[in-house]
Amino acid sequence: MEKRERHFVLVHGACHGAWCWYKVTTFLRSAGHKVTALDLAAAGANGKRLDELNSISDYHEPLMKFMTSLVAGEKVILVAHSLGGVSVSVAMERFPQKISVAVFVSAYMPGPDFNLSTVYQELHQRRQGASKDTQYTFDRGSNNPPTSIIFSPEDLAAKLYQLSPPEDLTLATTLMRPTKLFRGENLLKETTVTREKYGTVRRVYIVCDKDNILKEDFQRWMIKNNPSDEVKVIMGSDHMPMFSKPLDLCAYLQEIVESYS
């Protein structure tokens, strides 16, 4: 029986862009699927500047515009990596009828009873995330919280890409852009999700067991507090499975789409 084409929508994490999915995009297209890898605002090749982003809604606007553009009856598979999980969660809340399944790949996964502030606080308490080598910008002065972040070459090599091919690390150091940091009540309001909408979309979480920035115990803590329909594990993957274990990631994505589409 001929396989039906599915449409994967790939959403990158902080400081990255659509470029980070080049291996996954190539593999899925060669398998007969349609793939859209998006650049969020002021990321990748997107033309926006950081100072044009006033809220996290501005940041994930390209994904929301894309979801709005889908024709009636069309459903996509949303794949989120890292910080992309926040944008995908909001898309699930706004467009549940347009999503067949959402896949969180070592990604932030807030939920109806588990907001983004709780996720960030737990990450901070575990002393995970970016290190002292990370480069921050303080556009509102050094007495105020930082306004943007970009991973240092040291963080990339030790925490994100430690098991990835060196040429992909070089690619990242060439193409990365800073990510705006959003805070306050508006952040929580704009990322709130509900059981009635977000909760109706099926979710799969893919754990990366050798992730040095969102460690496995933190990933499983999110899953425990906001259970997904299924959990898969990529063994021997750093934070960037699209580089360190691209075939394993693509195999899982194809399994998921067969089960949930």
Curated annotation (Swiss-Prot):
Residue ranges of domain AB hydrolase-1 in the record: 8-251
Keyword field: Hydrolase
Active site: 82 (acyl-ester intermediate), 211 (charge relay system), 239 (charge relay system)
Listed InterPro entries: AB_hydrolase_1 (IPR000073), AB_hydrolase_fold (IPR029058), MES/HNL (IPR045889)
EC number of this enzyme: 3.1.1.-
General function of this protein: Methylesterase that catalyzes the hydrolysis of methyl jasmonate (MeJA) into jasmonate (JA). Can also use methyl salicylate (MeSA) as substrate with a lower efficiency.
Similarity remark: Belongs to the AB hydrolase superfamily. Methylesterase family.
Name this polypeptide is given: Methyl jasmonate esterase 1
Phylogenetic lineage: Eukaryota, Viridiplantae, Streptophyta, Embryophyta, Tracheophyta
Gene that produces this protein: MJE1
